[in-house]
Curated annotation (Swiss-Prot):
Gene3D superfamilies: GroEL, GroEL-like equatorial domain, TCP-1-like chaperonin intermediate domain. PANTHER family: CHAPERONIN (PTHR11353). This is Thermosome subunit alpha. Disulfide bonds: none annotated. SUPFAM superfamilies: GroEL apical domain-like (SSF52029), GroEL equatorial domain-like (SSF48592), GroEL-intermediate domain like (SSF54849). It comes from Saccharolobus solfataricus (strain ATCC 35092 / DSM 1617 / JCM 11322 / P2). The lineage of its organism: Archaea, Thermoproteota, Thermoprotei, Sulfolobales, Sulfolobaceae. Pfam families: Cpn60_TCP1 (PF00118). Forms a Heterooligomeric complex of two stacked eight-membered rings. The gene is thsA. Residues 535-547 have a biased composition (Basic and acidic residues).
């Protein structure tokens, strides 16, 4: 009898074939089910508590999947899909995960009919490509040539409202103010493109949070805000027509890299040593004054003696500014970052109409307005507590991304599940023209798309199945813009009339992220998991749950 061959390390578990596939599908479906209730304007929040006890309350899909510390490898594929969605378009993360889960659920039914995973994957790819082809035909191109026109602003307002309505804690006048701020910020930094759209660099829009007041106290600053204060009481608090030196060099005597000692034998030598140090710092300040600087913003420290000399020269100074802020200042002010003060020239200076220290709540902040490059803006958020501010920041980021997407590709689609239903109907027609078992996979893709309006109907308080049947019937009659008005709790024939719209770029990316994640999981037929480290075993974590366990068992998503 031949000796056994040990191929894998002792303790390694292996699940193969349909067991591995079903295990992975179950893990992905479980994650999608967790996010399901967070979809749409009336989506519910999740309370996430990390290992340090910090609490996050949010219904933002990207934040939920990032903070959940998911362990199952298949569920991690959905997390990566959500991250890709967030990085690419900044919105639609919950939709992408929910749709991927629905695609896998429908695929599981096909697997039960003994349809090979390869056929399902090919069918899904054909359905995805057909959906991408149909989207521009079902959308409406909008005119945004003049961003300051009432027509363009009205369209941008509708997009921002659709995004913020599902997330933002504000309503009424507060919500309107936030929408206006977001639109003003985007319009301010938009650069025209040859195709009629606009390029928007979101790096030029900075968001700062300051506890105190209410959301309505938030302001948009056409310039930048530094969460710092002027370093010396003798310095001016307000400088107009500011010539600004942006430094990443320290205004202090730096310690030598090698250890050194000095031998002092008399008090005069101490005085001479200190005088030389003061002269060194004074020379640096004199150099900055000689090139015309009346404001100094430093990434590193500013010595007390240097502060004194700067104050005597009437120069406003701020120290220990974040590197990211220094880089934004370089762009906004038209400055060059000064690394060597002795080599600084007047051409290195940036310009702003006003630099002023102001009190915000209990703190002081430095406002830089009227910058040379007026495209840099700063949104200063106010709120009653840190959790509200964090959620407001996430919401505004999503709205900024949504507006950027519509400016890059100015085509809008009907929201409220209308586009998914219309795509599903068209894909079923397309499936009939495709021969073989792939037809079933395309129909399954269409069924999965209907999961979105189904969930929206549920969150609106409607009876889900009867609502879906009603929506299908209306779309069959040619009412292609029929969707769910979640806020009103009813089905409407024209979601455009209620400003329920979505950018085509977001929807295209949702389809791409969900299809790629689902097909990647369907391709896996072998799950090989190494034994956990001994320290993990001592912690009581079994290897079977870590690796997905035996085929058909419930996978563990988290720790």
């Amino acid at each position: 009898m031949a000796a056994p061959v040990l191929l894998l390390k002792e303790g390694t578990s292996r699940t193969t074939g349909r067991d591995a596939l079903r295990n992975n599908i179950l893990a992905a479906k479980t994650l999608a089910e967790m996010l399901r209730s967070s979809l749409g304007p009336k989506g519910l929040d999740k309370m996430l508590i990390d290992s340090f006890g910090d609490v996050t309350i949010t219904n933002d899909g990207a934040t939920i999947v990032k903070d959940m510390e998911i362990q199952h490898p298949a569920a991690k594929l959905l997390v990566e899909a959500a991250k890709a969605q967030d990085a690419e378009v900044g919105d639609g993360t919950t939709s992408a995960v929910v749709l991927a889960g629905a695609l896998l659920e429908k695929a599981e039914s096909l697997l039960d009919q003994n349809i090979h995973p390869t056929i399902i994957i090919e069918g899904y790819k054909k359905a995805y490509n057909k959906a991408l082809e149909l989207l521009p035909q079902l959308g409406t191109r909008i005119d945004i040539k003049d961003l300051n026109s009432s027509v363009a602003r009205d369209t941008l307002r509708k997009i921002a409202f659709t995004t913020l309505a599902s997330k933002f804690i504000a309503e009424g006048a507060e919500l309107n103010k936030i929408i206006d701020m977001v639109i003003d910020a985007i319009v301010n930094v938009a650069e025209p493109l040859p195709n009629g759209g606009y390029n928007v660099s979101l790096d030029l829009i900075k968001i700062d949070k300051k506890k105190g007041g209410s959301i309505e106290d938030s302001v948009l600053v056409k310039g930048l805000v530094l969460d710092k204060e002027v370093v010396h009481p003798g310095m001016p608090r307000r400088v107009t027509k500011a010539k600004i030196a942006v430094l990443d060099a320290a205004l202090e005597v730096e310690k030598p890299e090698i250890s050194a000692k000095i031998s002092i034998t008399s008090p005069e030598q101490i005085k001479a040593f200190l005088d030389e140090e003061s002269k060194y710092l004074k020379d640096m300040v004199d150099k900055l004054a000689s090139i015309g600087a009346n404001v100094v913003i430093c990434q590193k420290g500013i010595d007390d003696i240097a502060q004194h000399f700067l104050a005597k020269k009437g120069i406003l100074a701020v120290r220990r500014v974040k590197r990211s802020d220094i880089e934004k200042l370089e762009k906004a002010l038209g400055a060059r970052i000064i690394s060597s003060i002795k080599d600084a020239t007047p051409e290195d200076l940036g310009y702003a109409e006003l630099v002023e220290e102001r009190r915000v709540g209990n703190d002081k902040m430095v406002f830089i307005e009227g910058a040379k490059n007026l495209k840099a803006v700063n949104i200063l958020l106010r709120g009653s507590n840190d959790m509200a501010l964090d959620e407001a920041e996430r919401s505004i980021n999503d709205a900024l991304h949504a507006l950027r997407n519509i400016l890059l590709e100015p085509v809008i689609l009907p929201g409220g599940g209308a586009i998914e239903l219309e795509l599903a109907m068209k894909l079923r027609e397309y499936a009939r023209s495709v021969g073989g078992k792939e037809q079933l996979a395309i129909e399954a893709f269409a069924d999965a798309l209907e999961e979105i309006p189904l969930i929206l109907a549920e969150t609106a308080g409607l009876e889900a199945i009867s609502s879906l049947m009603d929506l299908r019937a209306r779309h069959a009659k040619g009412l292609s813009n029929t969707g769910v008005d979640v806020i009103g709790g009813k089905i409407v024939d024209d979601v455009y009339a209620l400003n329920i719209i979505e950018p085509i770029r977001v929807k295209s990316q949702v389809l791409k992220s969900a299809t790629e994640a689902a097909t990647a999981i369907l391709k896996i037929d072998d799950l090989i998991a190494a034994a956990p480290l001994k320290s993990e075993k001592k912690g009581g974590e079994g290897s079977k749950e870590e690796s997905g366990g035996e085929g058909g068992s419930t996978p563990s998503l988290g720790d």
